[in-house]
Amino acid sequence: MINAKLASQSHANHQTIVKLSEQVSVGGTELVIIGGPCTVESLEQMETVASQLAAAPVQALRGGVYKPRTSPYAFQGMGVEGLQILADVRSRYNVPVVTEVMSIGQIEAVAADADMLQIGSRNMQNFDLLKALGQAGKPILLKRGLASTIEEFVMAAEYILSHGNPDVVLCERGIRSFDNYTRNVLDLGAVAALKQITHLPVIVDPSHAVGKRELVAPLAKAAIACGADGLIIECHPEPEKSVSDARQALSLEDMVNLVHSLRPVAAAVGRNISEVGAGFSLQPAPIHFSAKKPCGLTA
């Protein structure tokens, strides 16, 4: 029995619905799809993503500006500059954005420009960070640690809830295994269990679970079939040129096709894909791009 006083199903007589904006919520009968690149690389990139994914539709955009990388020599993200790009796209297209925070010092700035703050797998048990997020005033997307038990995952959410933030969404993103054919192993049993254990919404990240774009669609469908409230999927205008996690990124065309293919699966389990994103591509203001290379990288 998991001793989660606030996260447990017994604490609430309803399933929690977390609002990202006036039109977009996670939980309930409508499934939410969050899409976008692993890393924010340029304003032009994010404009392209936002305009094309509106047709899917995708209800929120993701994009990393602070990147926790295994190697200290890997690109660490655009930081404040990337955050400004997200803010511009969010404002111009009236679309919620999700991005990761890695430290307490980043919370205030990220919360000012993002609609949901993500806690990545590596920080799932960064307890001081979790406590601080209890006062962030924004919904939190909490990813499961790569070697964490279900109980540890739920208790990490409990830290955020117990420090004042009721808006927590859980994300199953795969756990480490002896088999390295896929990047991780997607634990769909955990999704079903979490839906019984807690009242919190649960979404799935099939991109990080498998690390191979050709396997993302089957696992996305399986996630919806087993009760997930939504998906967060990586996609890129030119996947092979992505500065991080290129192998798992879908093309924007494949992303749109995937969302369409999810509809009959959702219908089979009494759910439907939200149509909200179909209206977020408003008339963007003309933008003049500089010749600066994405991420400040040199050729």
Region roles according to the model:
Residues 1-34, 267-272, 287-289, 295-299:
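N-terminal amphipathic alpha-helix/helix-capping segment at the start of soluble metabolic enzymes
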Residues 31-46, 72-76, 96-100, 120-121, ...:
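Active-site mouth loops of central-metabolism enzymes
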Residues 32-37, 59-63, 97-99, 117-119, ...:
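Hydrophobic faces of well-ordered beta-strands that scaffold small-molecule active sites
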Residues 62-81, 237-247:
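Glycine-rich, proline-tolerant flexible connector loops at the mouths of alpha/beta enzymes
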Residues 75-99, 133-139, 188-202, 248-270:
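Alpha-helix-loop-beta-strand connector modules within alpha/beta enzyme cores
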Residues 78, 95-105, 115-127, 139-150, ...:
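Catalytic beta/alpha-barrel core
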Residues 136-237:
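Catalytic alpha/beta core domains of metabolic enzymes, predominantly
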Residues 278-283:
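Intrinsic, low-complexity polybasic segments
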